[in-house]
Each structure stands twice: as C-alpha cells, then as structure tokens.
C-alpha cells in the first residue's frame, strides 16, 4: 500500500463508547483503532460522546474523526449530522446511508424494490397482538425464523425461533429493544458470508461458521470457536459475482466508503442479503481486519486506509 503522510490528517478524534447496547464492543474497537493510528504517526485521540459534548470536538481543534461507535446515535445518522454541522470529516457513510443502513426493516424495503435478494420477512410493531401476529407469520413464512430488533447491531437480541409456540415470547423480548421488529425466514443450506468494503481495497469474502446455532453476539465478540474461512470455499467467479452484488446492496442504501454486507446462501447457492453494517467492529474478533490480513494488509494499514477515505472530495 502507498505511504501516506500522517500530518495531512491533522488532529483526529477516535469516536468510541457511546450509550448504545454495543458500548463495550465500541470501546474495544476504538482502543485498537486508536493504537493503530498512533502507531502510524497520526495525531489521534479518544473521544467518548457519552462523556463529553460533541461541541468539544470543534473547540479542541479536531478536523477529522474515525467513527468506531456501534449502534444507536453513532450509527444511525445523528453523529454524522453533528459532524457535518461542525465541518469535521469522518469515516463511513453520511447521514442518509447511516440511518438507512442501521434500519433492517427499511433496508429490506429498499432491497425488495431494487431487486436485491433478501429473505422473506414480516414486520411486527410494539403493541401489536403478538399471539395473533405469530400465527399469521408462521402461516406465511414457515419455520425456522429469525426475530430481530430493526435497529440494533452486533446481533443484539436476535433470536432464532424453531417452533410456533416460541414466537410470541421472542417478539415480546425483541420489542424491548426497538418498536419495530423484523421476523425473517431463515435461509438454510449454504452458509453465512460477509463481504467487507473499504474504498477500492479488494478484500476477500469470508464464510462464517459459528459453533452454535447462528452468528450471535457471543460468537462475534466472545467465543473463540467460531470459524472464519478465507478462502470462503466459493469459486473465483462466484466470489467475484457476490462482491459486485454486495457492493450494489451497500450502494443503493446510500452507504459509502467503508462497511460490510452480510448474506446467506441457500442450498442452491442463491444469495440472500441480511443487512449492511456502516460502522463495522474493529476488535480482534472482527471481520474487516481478518479479511485485510488475508491479503497482506495489516491492522494499522487498514485503519489508515479507511481514514484516508476522508481526504477525498
């Protein structure tokens, strides 16, 4: 990778922590990002919006931000809007792409409209008759199902439901986290994959093989028995085709520069996109560093390359 003069970045804030359900993940990501940037000679400093007002960024002379916040206001367009207001360049998507990318329900509506394959689903609202909706959904989608709060990341409160009797309780649990819940048909037979996006870097698709039922919060950030397969087992042509489709799934939401698109394959190899992530985890368990490392890009090189995307017009 080409060398970049660290001085051109100016004073950089690494946004970490925040007050979402993913605070601990964000703190872990942010600390590693901070170290990577500092090791590259960049004038980087930690900044936790849960502890300090955002106005301090401008007051203290920050000109750029690496967004390592996950979920909540760090990923739903609010932080992005504030940074735009203060004239501070930042990593990742802007207001629209961030807001839409975090909202699984509206993401799937856009994908349906534009022909991006996504699993069949139903939406349940807080306050609905959960017993009645559960019966309707099982009749329409069958089993098994995934129940997901529309706007939580890191698989927070995602529940796999295998029996009709278990669905009402899963809905009651999920609406504690969001007023809209997505109930999605489980795609079986071909495995789970992710395509990492970082500007023009050509990163490999990763196949994810969790030891448990699915790739949940524990598998993502705690367990050491999740398998990450690179190469992912697809042919070169299949992988190239899925990278193009993943980029399109990302782009049509207004997402830019940096993120991830997650998808399943069915038994016939057909892809179904689940969600995008516009502020991916950057812990030692996270997927973008693994994809980068597989093609000879170090953690430090990756975070500098992502930050460098803020230099373009």
UniProtKB/Swiss-Prot annotation:
ATP binds at residues 138-193. Binds 2 magnesium or manganese ions per subunit. One of its GO terms (biological process) is cell wall organization. Pathway: Cell wall biogenesis; peptidoglycan biosynthesis. Its main location: cytoplasm. The keyword Membrane does not apply. Mg(2+) 2 binds at residues 275, 277. It is an enzyme of class 6 (ligase). Gene3D superfamilies: 3.40.50.20, ATP-grasp fold, A domain, ATP-grasp fold, B domain. Its cofactor is Mg(2+); Mn(2+). It catalyses: 2 D-alanine + ATP = D-alanyl-D-alanine + ADP + phosphate + H(+). It is found in: Cytoplasm. Coiled coil: none annotated. Mg(2+) 1 binds at residues 262, 275. Its EC number is 6.3.2.4. Cell wall formation. Belongs to the D-alanine--D-alanine ligase family. HAMAP family: Dala_Dala_lig. NCBIfam families: D_ala_D_alaTIGR, PRK01372.1. This is D-alanine--D-alanine ligase. The gene is ddl.
